[in-house]
Amino acid sequence: MRIGKVKESILKRSVLRQLHNHSEQGSPASGEDAGVLFMLEFMPEFTQGFSEKNGVAMAVNPVEGWTFAAKRAVYGAVNSMLAAGAAPKAISLSILMPEEAEEKQLKALIKEIDSLCMQENILVLSGHTAVSPYVSTLILSVTAMGSITENRKDITANKENNTANKGSIADSKGNTKQITVVNADLDLVVAGTVGREGAAMLAAEYAKRLEERYAPSYIEAAKHLFDDGSMTAVADILQEKEVVSVHDVREGGIFAALWEMAAAANVGLSIDLKNIPIKQHTIEVCEYFNLNPYMLRSGGTLLLACANGARIVEQLKNAGVEAAVIGQTTAGNDRLIRYDDEARFLEPPKMDEYYKVN
């Protein structure tokens, strides 16, 4: 396709006509400068601006490359909203493609995004689609929007005394309300299996190489590790009173997510490596490429800090999500990963293991 914004004919044929989830809340259109989301239908409190108990959550998630791009875009948007304690409502897309990209690739991408958005009951609100000489593969930037209530989860701690039991946020009138934050002696729960996003991508991109060691049927199964990457089914569980904080596990894997949560809350960690849920397919793919599966992108996985992890794990399993208590938060700053009688310190996030394969 030509460099610059895609032709109007391509935009209409391969983008707008592939989007079917329109409503009075908003819909994308050619020539419009912005998408408009009418909040009154699903957030009546917006009639007078932000209310004391509700607001809007927004997040931006980048997706690089064509492999499972639609799933990574939509599931990433949905899970980032759920982790923030928000109900996902809409996404906006910025799509940049290399010059050699074909219209059929764009059409297939939008068609799958539309299908997933309908499945998740969210809108594609607006977007920008262009071909750029500065990119060598698909670059998809997804802005997610959700409605949020006073029950939102927060991980910010009092960094002065490391005891933060409560924090506060200001409403539209400048008043404050209390929110629970992460402190020591909480259970850490992983919902979903770690490394599955990265393992599925590697299985799809390097199937021929993997066939040197594994059966084609085994590799095919690995490609589907990320098929159930949405956590919408457990949204209500994430709002249970025992759940203090939720963190979306993505680039850098579970080790990065653990560090980010602990650093934000100024707490220590004690993690049992053997308790972290992981699929054998993920382990095998990582062994072939000599990768650390705990540092591999893990879209479709959430990290929870809970007051009663065992109860939350039981609920997650009853909802069909693999889950486990993997450790606890501790006082101080020691962040330890334990394996049997050995222990080592967790290090700050490094480059995702996915990028090591070429």
Residue ranges and their predicted role:
Residues 305-311:
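Helix N-cap motif at beta-to-alpha junctions
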Residues 26-29, 57-59, 123-127, 189-192, ...:
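General beta-strand structural signal in soluble alpha/beta enzymes
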Residues 1-65, 84, 93, 111-125, ...:
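Extreme N-terminal cap/leader segments of soluble proteins
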